[in-house]
Amino acid sequence: MFRFIKKSTNTPMLGVDFGSSTIKAVAVSGSAESFSIDSWAEIATPKGAIRDFQLQDVDRVSQAFKQLLRMLPGKYKNAATAVNGSSVITKITQVASNINQIDFENIVMMEAEQLIPFPLDEVSLDFEVLGPNITDPARNDVLICAARSQSIASAISVFNDSDLTV
């Protein structure tokens, strides 16, 4: 599923929170086992640019984000953020553990069609196997996460405008 810092990387990364009142960034480096916070910055979100967890005015958010980047020491190439609010759905389902990866992924997609209240062509979908189900060890608990693609595209647009890789 989503990985904040890959185990083998020492590449500095920005973690960014696009909030309705402020945009915050924290610069981290290291690995998943041993990381450090190098710096952080915060700037006011342009009024009305983010409402109900959604970027309403990508251009104004992008300009504010560029100002925030100038407040941080150093240059960064990678960024990560989270999406939240009503555009994100998470569900846990169970899938048989004795099937191959391709069948497993197909079953997860069929489960997602039943569980996610949005058309699947409008969402970005990911899943993570949580492990054996407590009551039925022959099945795995699987966390399915779906976010409206438009929500993700807006954040990616802000990062791309600042030459950052998501």
Predicted regions and their residues:
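Charged, flexible boundary elements
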Residues: M1-F4, L164-V166
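Gly/Thr-rich phosphate-binding beta-strand-loop-beta motif of the actin/hexokinase/Hsp70
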Residues: F2-A44, P73, K77-N84
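Short, glycine- and charge-enriched coil/turn segments that flank and shape catalytic ligand pockets
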Residues: E33, R51-R60, G131-R139
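Switch/connector loops and helix/strand junctions flanking conserved nucleotide-binding motifs
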Residues: F35, R51-F53, V88-I92
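N-terminal phosphate-binding loop and adjacent alpha-helix
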Residues: S39-R70
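Phosphate/pyrophosphate-binding loops at sites that engage ATP/ADP/AMP, CoA/4′-phosphopantetheine
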Residues: F65-N78, S162
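Active-site neighborhood for divalent-cation/phosphate handling
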Residues: N78, A82-V166
